Amino acid sequence: MNLKEQVDLLTNKPGCYLFLNKDNEVIYVGKAKNLKKRVSTYFNKAYNIKTTRLIREITHLKYFIVDNEKESLLLEKNLIKKYRPKYNVLLNDDKTYPYIIITNQKDPMYKYVRKYEKKALRNYGPLPIGSNARSILLTLQRLFPLRMCKGDLKKPCLYYHLNQCSGACFKTVDSSYYEYQIKQVDKFFKGEINQVKQTLVKQMQKASDNLQFEQAKRIKDQITSLDFITAKQNVDIVTNKNIDVVNYEINEEKICFVMLFYRLGQLTYKDEYIQNYEGQDLDELLNSYLQQIYQKNLYPDVLLIPNEIDLLDLDENLLEFSSYSFNNQDDIFIKLAKQNAVDSLNKSILSNNVNSGDELEILDQLQQISNINKYPKRIEIFDISNIYNQFITGACIVYINAKPVRNEFRKYNIDSQYTSDYARMKFMLEKRFLKRIKEKEQLPDLIIVDGGIIQIHAAKEVLNKLNLKINVIGLSKDNNHKTRYLIDIFEQTIDIKNFKKLYNFLTSLQIRVDEYAKSGFRKKYHNQLNDQILLIKGVGKKTNLKLYKHFKTIDNIKNASFDELNKIINNKKITNLIISNFKK
């Protein structure tokens, strides 16, 4: 029976399905409310060459019928665990999410754990990476003592004498005591910790006065941990809810999921997961990722998901708290998660662009496709970036044998008098190669310009002027602003999407040179902003930082009204100084 016949015979009932290859290996496990409808979608879609690997590899399938969706969820989980299929989302079993819990016992106690515990009375987390969770735990034990010992010791334990145990070691502790302490801990994790900090500061000062410097340092470390866990974010968030935000990014080969955990208005933790993308159903992949996340984490009040994901395709246990973005604050969350996914995927490309042993193959292929007459051992890549046609920065990055040579990366300041892409590229290349000729520095075997025919012509004009015989090619992007085309030495456009290793390599070059150029104009932009504000007598760094964080650009500050400025500065005298200065 061929594969199509197997699909046609599927039932409309809920269940799990397994795709197998010619070696009878399970390569993908999925679940469905309607098996026939779900599996049929894999073979009815119009996939491109890149995303049909999964489909091409399937030779036969198996399936299990279940009574309801909850059963299929459990079965899917067990099947994935058993077979570990290569096309499923498989989060690392060793991955941990730090939590501080309060146990659900007659005499509860604190514990530091590596995942959410369903049976606990309280779960606080996931805690911020770098927050020194154990130090926070010590602070809680000192300030809001619960049981610290095994209990029922018939005598006070050492911790009781240190005021760190409830006394369950030798007496019956009233439940109201624990209720009060736990309420205080709840407030602590909501960020209501001014009183806590004041107590710690007094203890630190007392220890210092008594020359107990080690004790004072330990308390100081605890205060630092409190500052970390309750630190304000760059985005103003007004909510008392626990919010998780998921988003993703896909390129030609991989998919990256990112989950941001917000606890009481603060971003406390980020999870990211990258895997090969071979045309799997996106809703299924996201579902699988979320299920594995929540095996180890507490359900939030709200889970924000991207609008393009079908909410109804989520599992029942996720539907209860899942939502699309409904306001500006939600939009900020979703965009931030998206940006994190994009950045993570870009970093993955940069770190894995060339596997050891592939360099020769990639450069040989580049030589052939580009029609160049010389093996491109040394490649120099050029790009130009700007913001609003100001702060124009050129960048050159260098690769030797397909590996970046970071100490040879250079940035070039380009005057705003050069208004066209042609003039800017010409200026940068002339400046670079005149200096390298003068200092007898090594020249490249190949120049790659980020751009099209205009940038290539600018490069060729400079090389002709300097009598240099160096091959020049270009890299251009598609409508989605992703690397797609190579322009060879004959100025022919070649789609490189299907040359996997070369495509990944050139994509990484384009990402790296773009980021390097942007880092240059950002620095100049920030410096100019700081310089203009700080030149005003009476304006300090703190005021400058407040203005920059809120208004973003110097033009926005200049155009702001008195009330708008004073709302941020909260000092009428300084506000008048700034306004009068910009009117000069």
Curated annotation (Swiss-Prot):
UniProt cross-references to InterPro entries, sorted A to Z: GIY-YIG_endonuc, GIY-YIG_endonuc_sf, GIY-YIG_UvrC_Cho, RuvA_2-like, UVR_dom, UVR_dom_sf, UvrABC_protein_C, UvrC
| Location relative to the cell | Cytoplasm
Question: Is Lyase set as a keyword in this record?
Answer: no
Q: Which SMART domains match?
A: GIYc
Give the matching PROSITE patterns.
GIY_YIG, UVR, UVRC
Key words of the record? Cytoplasm, DNA damage, DNA excision, DNA repair, Excision nuclease, SOS response
Give the record's GO CC terms: cytoplasm; excinuclease repair complex
Q: Which GO terms describe its biological process?
A: nucleotide-excision repair; SOS response
Spell out the Pfam families in the cross-references: GIY-YIG, UVR, UvrC_RNaseH, UvrC_RNaseH_dom
Task performed by this protein: The UvrABC repair system catalyzes the recognition and processing of DNA lesions. UvrC both incises the 5' and 3' sides of the lesion. The N-terminal half is responsible for the 3' incision and the C-terminal half is responsible for the 5' incision.
Q: How does it assemble?
A: Interacts with UvrB in an incision complex.
By its UniProt entry, which HAMAP family does this protein fall under?
A: UvrC
Name the UniProt record assigns to this protein:
UvrABC system protein C
* Organism encoding this protein: Mycoplasma capricolum subsp. capricolum (strain California kid / ATCC 27343 / NCTC 10154)
| Gene designation | uvrC
